[in-house]
Amino acid sequence: GGDTRTTVYQSPHPLYADHGKGCRLYDVDGNEYIDFVNNHTSMIHGHAHPKIIGAVQQQLEKGTAWTAYNEHTIRLAQIICERVPSVEKIRFCNSGTEATMMALRAARAHTGRSKIIKTEGGYHGSHDAVEISIIPDPRLLGPIESPASVPEGGAAIPKGVLSDVVVIPFNEPDLAEPIIRRNASEVAAIIV
């Protein structure tokens, strides 16, 4: 309890921020930090950038939140499709967790296969299919040539989900390739 994001929780208590400016973050005790996390890289312009504040204020005058598409949604989708030729369609999501959940569901629907492959140590959101082997207990890792699927933090992830997640070692292509080949006929997606 007491925290809105499990990914930032630190024992005995997480950092409590008061405000940020540029690349600096200030906590409730007045300590100053260089913010290397930047909201998990979504804050590429830093905190309280004047142009961002201006754009947000301008939009707030039009309305705060709609459950409808708008011209900005359409334009952003067009820009992404123009810049990434292989992208033909866009589906916007509320979070990275929702995005990976929907991507894996689409891959499973498209292929008719249930397994996914993920890298050991890779974070892809907070749902059962990807909360596996993010920071696994070293005693449970298994051999490097065949890493075990370890539920994150002892999470109550169903055994069926665990058996559908194949873990490959990070940045070890020679070790990952045989694992991928062994499971290829059952794999819907590889998430990196």
Language-model-detected regions and their locations in the chain:
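Active-site-adjacent loop/helix segments that line or gate small-molecule/cofactor pockets in enzymes
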Residues: 1-19
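Generic structural signal for secondary-structure transition and capping sites
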Residues: 1-4, 61, 85, 185
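Active-site and channel-lining beta-strand-loop segments
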Residues: 14-35
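Short glycine/serine/threonine-biased micro-segments
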Residues: 18-20, 37, 44, 94, ...
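Short beta-strand-to-turn element immediately C-terminal to the catalytic PLP-Schiff-base lysine
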Residues: 26, 45-46, 132-133
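Glycine-rich loop-to-alpha-helix module at the N-terminal edge of alpha/beta enzyme cores
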Residues: 32-114
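PLP-dependent aspartate aminotransferase-fold enzymes
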Residues: 78-186
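Condensing-enzyme catalytic core of the thiolase-fold
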Residues: 188-192
